[in-house]
A protein has these predicted regions:
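Active-site loop immediately N-terminal to the catalytic Tyr-X3-Lys motif
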Residues: 92, 143-149, 171, 210, ...
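Short C-terminal tail/terminal secondary-structure segment
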Residues: 223, 234-255
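Active-site helix of classical SDR
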Residues: 114, 154
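Substrate-binding pocket helix/loop in short-chain dehydrogenase/reductase
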Residues: 90-91, 98-103, 203
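Short, small/polar-rich loop/turn modules that mediate ligand/substrate recognition or access, typified
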Residues: 80, 170, 175, 233-235
Length: 255
């Protein structure tokens, strides 16, 4: 019986790249996204990917999507919660509606999807090696920066959720980890780069490597966390920021 993975936010960016990698490793992958249709279908963009509509801000939509997955596959071995939303700007000026919308996707939605997957993980026939939960955190949740306060705060909350769920689910053999990327060249970040004048999302991503991450760079870390080499890794928040945090010099001491 094949391993079954769910990936939220699978229509583009990190989610799509992760789906491609896992399918190449023999996984059966169901991608969830608001841009997909309401019936389980085969993607015309990623060979082997099954797609299904899901709005992670709506608990009913999540329940419906997972019900379809349960009736089709009977179990789940892994979930990658990569659906995300980015808004930048001063916390003191951010509209409440924008803050709430970010929270609904980045924190609450990720937690709801992970929670909904647990009963299906308990039915996995591969309990000797799985299940796994991987959240998409952010380096912004480790090293806050001006203009990214709301996003960083909500990703920091997700890091706490990762740690606590790892402790809660460890006795059942369910591993829970998070990847904390720096700037990644995704449509979401590109859109903010085009509209932002803050400089925080410029093409180099402030990395000493001189470039931002490609989605494939982050997907590779996720693939590791879902593989046998990570059998003893749980509760980890793994930075994948190209050295951005290591090279950070506070503005007050620059000069």
């Amino acid at each position: 019986m094949s391993r079954v993975a769910i990936i939220t936010g699978a229509a583009s960016g990190i989610g799509r790249s992760t789906a491609h990698r896992l399918i190449g490793q023999g996984w059966s992958v169901v991608g969830l996204d608001v841009s997909f249709g309401s019936e389980l279908a085969t993607s015309d963009k990623v060979d082997g990917l099954k797609t299904l509509y899901c709005d992670v801000t709506n608990e009913g939509s999540i329940v419906d999507a997972f019900g379809t997955i349960a009736s089709t596959y009977g179990h789940v071995d892994a979930i990658v919660c990569s659906a995300g939303k980015l808004e930048i700007g001063p916390l003191s000026e951010m509209p409440v509606e924008d803050f709430d919308r970010l929270y609904q996707v980045n924190t609450r939605g990720a937690w709801l999807c992970a929670r909904q997957s647990i009963p299906l993980m308990r039915k996995s026939p591969h309990r000797d090696k799985f299940p796994r939960i991987v959240f998409l955190g952010s380096i912004a949740g480790i090293r806050p920066k001006v203009s990214g306060g709301a996003y960083g705060a909500q990703k920091a909350a997700l890091h706490v959720i990762t740690s606590v769920m790892a402790a809660e689910l460890g006795p059942e053999g369910i591993l829970v980890n998070a990847v904390a990327p720096g700037t990644v060249d995704t449509p979401m970040v590109q859109a903010k780069s085009d509209s932002s004048k803050t400089g925080d999302y410029r093409p180099s991503g402030n990395s000493p490597l001189g470039r931002v991450a490609a989605p494939e760079d982050i997907a590779a870390v996720i693939e590791f966390l879902l593989g046998e080499q990570a059998n003893y890794v749980t509760g980890a928040i793994i930075p994948a920021d190209g050295g951005t945090r290591a090279a950070f010099i506070p503005p007050a001491v620059q000069g």
